[in-house]
Amino acid sequence: MCIRDRLWIVDSYSLVLSALLVPMGAIGDRIGRRKLLLIGSTGFAAISALAAFAPSALMLVVARALLGIFGAMLMPATLSIIRNIFVDATERRIAIAVWASGFSAGAALGPIVGGFLLEHFDWGSVFLLAVPILIPLLILAPIMVPESKDPNPSPVDPLSILLIMTGMTGITFGLTHTSETGFDAVAISTILAGLCFIVLFVLRQLNREKNDIQPMLDVRLFRNTVFTGAITANLISMMVDVGFIYFASQHLQLVSGLPPMYAGMLLIPGTLAIIIAGLVIARVAVHFHPAQVVSFGLALHAAAFAVLAFLGAHNDLVIILIFIVLGTGIGIAQTISNDLMLSSVPPRKAGAASAISETSYETGTVLGTVIIGGMLTAVYRANVVVPDGLDETLADHAHETLGGAVTVASQVGGEQANQLLSSAFAAFDSGVVLSSAFSAVLMGVMAVISYFMIRKAPREMKPADH
């Protein structure tokens, strides 16, 4: 399997997912969120089973793209169902905290379970794992989850769907391409084209409202500073969080030499911090203004990265402790920001609003890889010193990434290997320090901005019902 095939296998899912989140959110409002959840779960389980036995790289790319379609059904449906079931503010926040904890637990357990499966079974077992997880959902959801939908849905607008799909695909492809090859003509042109289609989508929504035609997405929501502040806080925090996981996983596996399974286990305390902080803040947030809570959570982000920038990633204990502080900030900020986002819209539009939230998460994930990951890689390449006498091909490989340096060192051995690893580890740590300092400043600024954007929210956020 060539490198290009591997890239498409990885990227096809996120490309399709990001393109379809907003349309699927609107479809859920129209046909029913529970129905969309069941369709998405059934399709995701079925395609996962097929992907496990894909006979070629092309078929695996197609399977991953199909998983993106059904994944786009699942993500906004779950959050919008919470919006419609839980009216009481405290109960809704607890439900959101549990919902967010599921994603966090999945992110932490993924490397552990995936590493175990790949160590003992064929690669297809990773896809098969989704099947037994989704079967209980398919059995229990029709019994336990009530149906909800928009009683007056907007008419289907194929042009709006095409515009948002094309726009998000262009932006996501361009950013993903940037993380792999840098800002070249392809990346710049696709990002700009994507932004143009997004502008056309917004103009069409405004035009439909002007002509008293219900739009697919009420873009006027972004005039609400509380809604926009919550969405922006989620996007930026996700960007730096992904950046942390990006270099933490490399440190644990490449510098410390831990297998993926054990590296993932060291991240469990931080994941538990996310879960506990979310559940606790859901109950005590009633005593504080939402702006104070979100800003405090983002400030914890800034503090964690500031300490990491000062100390550097010299040992595993630093990584673990930093992730605990960071996880606490994640649990606090994202639980309340998601509640603010959901409460800012009427129940009938919960699907579309949830899709915007999920899109911000996906965009933040890509930006984390591009910006934080790109910064880390650039600093590494500027500081790593390759020993003299090394084969040119091997030298280039070692100069590209830390993983490349570790691979080359294992091949050459001896004093050259020791010199290369020493230089590579120092260069990588320099990248961690700079990217952490950047993240600390960014989150400090975001903590202040989010406070002023969200402070207009009432102390006890009541769901919009109009």
Model-derived segments and spans:
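Transmembrane core module of solute transporters
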Residues: R4, W8-V16, D122, L159, ...
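Structural signature of transmembrane alpha-helices in multi-pass secondary transporters
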Residues: Y13, L17, G68, A97-A107, ...
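Helix-loop-helix hairpins in multi-pass membrane proteins, especially solute transporters
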Residues: A26-L159
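Interfacial helix-cap and linker-helix signal at transmembrane-aqueous boundaries
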Residues: I27-G28, V113-F121, L175, L252-Q253, ...
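Residue-level signature of the transmembrane alpha-helical cores
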Residues: I39-G43, I47, A63, F70, ...
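Loop-to-transmembrane helix entry/capping segments in MFS-fold secondary transporters
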Residues: A89-W99, P260, P347-I356
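Hydrophobic transmembrane-helix bundles of small-molecule transporters
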Residues: A97, E119-A233, V240, L258, ...
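Hydrophobic transmembrane architecture of multi-pass small-molecule transporters
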Residues: P136, L340, Y361-R455, E460, ...
